[in-house]
From Swiss-Prot:
InterPro entries for this protein: Nucleotide-bd_a/b_plait_sf, RBD_domain_sf, RRM_dom, snRNP35_RRM, U1_U11-U12_snRNP_70-35kDa
An annotated GO BP: mRNA splicing, via spliceosome
One Pfam family hit: RRM_1
GO CC terms of this entry: precatalytic spliceosome; U12-type spliceosomal complex
Organism: Xenopus laevis
Coiled-coil portions: 221-258
A molecular function GO annotation: mRNA binding
Chief localisation class: nucleus
Amino acid composition bias (Basic and acidic residues), ranges on this chain: 146-162, 190-272
Subcellular location, record wording: Nucleus
Descriptive protein name: U11/U12 small nuclear ribonucleoprotein 35 kDa protein
């Protein structure tokens, strides 16, 4: 627990679907399937992974031309790869779109998610296969959480910081060490740390609203365990409901911050 960070340094399917990244047991069969899977990234894939967008939940009728028509509104496209079945040639329902400029991919990531194309609401995120060590695709049970309707603890599917665990104390030296460590994370980690700091403040408010700590030591009973489990369940439900309510309001501000920090990060890399 002391090594908890809001940003995943490598992909762990057990923690990927968790709200706070502290789960110790798989909560559904998809997570278990991902834990047992072994995925080797395609080394034949070309292009800049930091300028590549992942688009899924596409209609079988959606073509490369349709994708170009829709996504070219955000900027100049360098390459589109609609993944097809090797035997039948039919679309597998997902594609990769590489842009020429950083501001184009940031704009598409911000505005194109949940866009309706050919009567299907699509899912859009940055490519993670070449950017996150140990990545397991959703078709093998991986990814970052499914739909809310599927009962996932951490739904939405997009790469984002974990919520701070309610039983994790915060000390100044830990905060400083975490901040220094985040600077060494993969591309786009800085902007996600801003979200973590905001969520830290949310955690403080939740704690003020009712988390009580024992005044003195006493034996830990079965009733205590059941009460703690029920309390944790209520807190998770409350945070999940609050996250739903605030998501739309925070998205715009979050993406603007992401775009500024990501552009600065890429500029620093080019100057090295």
């Amino acid at each position: 627990m002391n090594e908890w960070t809001p940003i995943a340094k490598k992909y762990d399917p057990l923690k990927a679907g968790s709200i706070d990244g502290t789960d110790e047991e798989p909560h559904d069969r998809a997570v278990l399937r991902a834990m047992l899977s072994r995925y080797v990234p395609n080394k034949g894939v070309t292009g800049d992974p930091h300028l590549t967008l992942f688009v899924s939940r596409l209609s079988p009728q959606t073509t490369e031309e349709k994708l170009k028509e829709v996504f070219s509104r955000y900027g100049d496209i360098k390459r589109i790869r609609l993944v097809r079945d090797f035997i039948t040639g039919f679309s597998k329902g997902y594609a990769f779109i590489e842009y020429k400029q950083e501001n184009a991919i940031m704009k598409a990531h911000r505005d194109a998610n949940k866009l309706v194309i050919d009567q299907r609401e699509v899912f859009v995120d940055f490519e993670l296969e070449r950017n996150l060590k140990g990545w397991i695709p959703r078709r093998f049970g991986g990814g970052f959480g499914g739909k809310k309707e599927s009962g996932q603890l951490r739904f939405g599917g997009r790469d984002r910081p974990f919520r701070k665990p309610i039983n994790l104390p915060v000390f100044p030296h830990q905060f400083n060490s975490e901040s220094r460590g985040e600077k060494r994370h993969r591309s786009r980690s800085r902007d996600r740390s801003h979200d973590w700091r905001g969520q830290r403040r949310d955690y403080g408010r939740d704690r003020d609203r009712g988390i009580r700590r024992p005044e003195k030591e006493r034996p830990y009973t079965k009733d205590d365990k059941e009460q703690n489990a029920e309390h944790t369940k209520r807190e998770r439900s409350r945070e999940q409901a609050k996250n739903d309510k605030d998501k739309e309001k925070k998205d715009s501000k979050r993406e603007r911050s992401r775009e500024r920090d990501y552009r600065k990060h890429r500029s620093d890399e080019h100057n090295r």
